[in-house]
Amino acid sequence: MSDIDNNLTSQTHQQATHQQETLDLSIALLERPSVTPNDDGCQDILSERLTQAGFDCEFMYYGDRQAKGEHAEVKNLWARRGTSNPVICFAGHTDVVPTGDEKNWTYPPFTPTIADGYLWARGAADMKTGIAAFTIAAERFVANHPQHNGSIAFLITSDEEGPSINGTVKVIETLEARQEKITYCLVGEPSSTDTLGDIIKNGRRGSLGAVLTVTGKQGHVAYPHLASNPIHAAMSALSELTNASWDNGNDYFPATSLQISNINGGTGATNVIPETLEVVFNFRFSTETTEDELKAKTHAIFDKYFKDSKAKYDIHWKLSGQPFLTPEGKLVSACQQAIKSVTGTDTTLSTSGGTSDGRFIAPTGAQVVELGVRNATIHQVDEKVEVDDLGRLAQIYERILENLLLD
């Protein structure tokens, strides 16, 4: 047998081993109905394995144990092996979104099922298989290279699919307070589109939400001179707002966009001018525009139209995350090389999509990249992931560790 044949045989065997180990751990995690913010024991499974691999594991709890909703207690796991730099951290979440009516699922959402080449379960794509793949990759890397350079870390939360106020952001605050820095962060969100590794996210747009409240005076529709219609007062300003150009984007980001998601006004009666109007809108913004610039331009538009109006307006702002970008460099290159070596794919860099917990990590100075399985079924009924991708993803993650910690 030639050296080429030996290498191919070895690679095939390695992939099969990675796949079975990743599949087994994925199933163990997917069996837990960890609907946000409930971890339901997933992090205990990870902690036990990582401790055996030489990681120091620390559970971090934030929030109120007695509360529900956004103030509920959240369980987070910080695990680290090594004390030196660079620190490569895998960030992920064990919580999942609700299933909806389980009768609509082909297979029970918390009974992981292998069928037609897929692993079906809530959280299969978003993102328990990603957590499993990196865990297997870390275990195998540590076993093969116990004296590796730098450190490997895990930051796992159960508050990514919810309000995201007692999860990753609080862990990062704790790490920053004790001067514990992440050099490279690999977020295991499902980034791929058509094939494993075809897309990696090297940045995300910022998200700035707003609730506009316009207050007028209620009255009869037949006597408009005795009332002040907040809907009429806002129409011209909203028209200009939705047609405004905010920036032209850049090589990494599309132009900043605005979308109105909700408009509420009226009493339900057809003969009553309402007193108030509420409009909810959101900016997804690039690095070409700042939060303050968006606010200032928005207020300038409304000030222009409300200057002589009897109605008054107020805007409540909520920033969900600043835009971030990891330019092509060591982390991006390590990911590209790993994907190419395992799948043969030349990956594409992208900043599309919604927000992720990477928005809390990037401001610390860490290079952040998102790389995971295909995202075609995330948050949907019959969420699933290709079984063959599990072993390959674990291999990709292991190659990334080799690229960053062995040179």
UniProtKB/Swiss-Prot annotation:
Disulfide bonds: none annotated. GO terms for biological process: diaminopimelate biosynthetic process; L-arginine biosynthetic process; lysine biosynthetic process via diaminopimelate. It catalyses: N-succinyl-(2S,6S)-2,6-diaminopimelate + H2O = (2S,6S)-2,6-diaminopimelate + succinate. It comes from Psychrobacter arcticus (strain DSM 17307 / VKM B-2377 / 273-4). Catalyzes the hydrolysis of N-succinyl-L,L-diaminopimelic acid (SDAP), forming succinate and LL-2,6-diaminopimelate (DAP), an intermediate involved in the bacterial biosynthesis of lysine and meso-diaminopimelic acid, an essential component of bacterial cell walls. Gene3D superfamilies: Zn peptidases. The lineage of its organism: Bacteria, Pseudomonadati, Pseudomonadota, Gammaproteobacteria, Moraxellales. Zn(2+) 2 binds at D126, E161, H379. It holds the Pfam family Peptidase_M20. Pathway: Amino-acid biosynthesis; L-lysine biosynthesis via DAP pathway; LL-2,6-diaminopimelate from (S)-tetrahydrodipicolinate (succinylase route): step 3/3. Residues 1-10 have a biased composition (Polar residues). Its EC number is 3.5.1.18. The active site is at D95, E160. Keywords: Amino-acid biosynthesis, Cobalt, Diaminopimelate biosynthesis, Hydrolase, Lysine biosynthesis, Metal-binding, Zinc. Binds 2 Zn(2+) or Co(2+) ions per subunit. This is Succinyl-diaminopimelate desuccinylase. Residues 11-20 have a biased composition (Low complexity). Transmembrane segments: none annotated.
